[in-house]
């Protein structure tokens, strides 16, 4: 009897300790690591939700930029962090689904070394064209590209990035062959588009919209499944090419083996942050839609997107 009583007490204390540990999270600041420098859409979104998460969790939530190698450095640092819920990674679709296909020598495995938390938000791209290009819509663009195969060049912010992938998917879907001209970043890519050195590019809303508003570029179409609120009169590519859809998305993940209850607590904090009116307004200005799906849904989505882009990369014979 004494042995059973002692066993009961030990078991009860263990359960209580586990309960207290779960209830005490978080007990110190949480760091959201980004693989890119400040100023981009990813950084803006992270800094919008961080203070809201802090209020919800009762601890500071700090955004830390660790740029380099297209996000690999930041992602690697989180893969090696303690799986305790205090260090998480927030990155782009490229980090989770394109880079792993293009680079087989990554110092981590997205599927094995990370625990998905949530897809934070998503955004369609915009097909921007030079003002001198004699086309008014996607159908005319395709016809012009077929009639002038040697005159059609598209720019991108770099080889293997989403703007490059979007244009290659457009090439394939439209049955055309435009030439890729990669740049070191979005700014020089767009500047040469304005100057007429290239004919078109696929880019984020925030990158090209000011130039559309100033009359330097034209927004021919957007790449999501529905029209953007900031460009309501601009059609989607899918109105001409059925099924065409390219969205950039932003997701959050923790090191593998992070306790499930902490993953779920972080997901809830992100979801609640995205419901705040000021956050929704700021995201809308960027042409970004909040998502906040479950960890399981996000994990499945990463795999689906990886498979999808692997086919695009294979069909276009894209190499790093």
What residue ranges belong to the model's regions?
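Anionic-ligand binding region
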Residues: 188-245
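Short hydrophobic alpha-helices and adjacent helix-cap/hinge residues
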Residues: 2-3, 24, 28, 52-56, ...
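Bacterial N-terminal signal peptides that target proteins for export
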Residues: 1-9, 15
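An extracytoplasmic/periplasmic, membrane-proximal ligand-sensing/linker region
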Residues: 27-29, 213, 260-320
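N-terminal signal peptide c-region/cleavage motif recognized by signal peptidases
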Residues: 17-19
């Amino acid at each position: 009897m004494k042995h059973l009583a002692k066993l009961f007490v030990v078991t009860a204390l263990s359960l209580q300790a586990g309960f207290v540990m779960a209830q005490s999270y978080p007990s110190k600041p949480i760091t959201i690591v980004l693989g890119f420098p400040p100023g981009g859409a990813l950084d803006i979104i992270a800094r919008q939700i961080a203070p809201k998460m802090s209020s919800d969790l009762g601890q500071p939530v700090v955004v830390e930029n660790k740029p380099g190698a297209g996000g690999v450095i930041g992602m690697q640092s989180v893969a090696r962090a303690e799986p305790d819920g205090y260090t998480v990674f927030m990155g782009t679709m490229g980090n989770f689904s394109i880079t792993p296909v293009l680079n087989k020598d990554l110092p981590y495995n997205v599927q094995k070394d990370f625990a998905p938390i949530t897809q934070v938000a998503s955004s369609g791209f915009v097909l921007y064209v030079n003002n001198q290009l004699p086309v008014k819509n996607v159908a005319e663009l395709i016809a012009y590209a077929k009639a002038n195969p040697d005159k059609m060049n598209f720019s991108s912010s770099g080889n293997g990035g989403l703007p490059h992938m979007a244009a290659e998917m457009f090439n394939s879907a439209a049955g055309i062959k435009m030439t890729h001209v990669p740049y070191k970043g979005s700014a020089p890519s767009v500047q040469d588009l304005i100057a007429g050195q290239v004919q078109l590019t696929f880019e984020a809303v925030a990158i090209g919209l000011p130039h559309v508003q100033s009359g330097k570029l034209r927004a021919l179409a957007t790449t999501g499944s529905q029209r953007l609120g900031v460009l309501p009169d601009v059609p989607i590519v899918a109105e001409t090419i059925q099924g065409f859809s390219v969205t950039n998305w932003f997701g959050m993940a923790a090191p593998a083996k992070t306790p499930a209850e902490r993953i779920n607590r972080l997901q809830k904090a992100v979801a609640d942050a995205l419901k705040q009116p000021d956050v929704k307004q700021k995201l809308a200005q960027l042409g970004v839609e909040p998502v906040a799906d479950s960890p399981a849904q996000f994990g499945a989505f990463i795999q689906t997107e990886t498979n999808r882009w692997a086919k695009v990369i294979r069909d276009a014979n894209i190499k790093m």
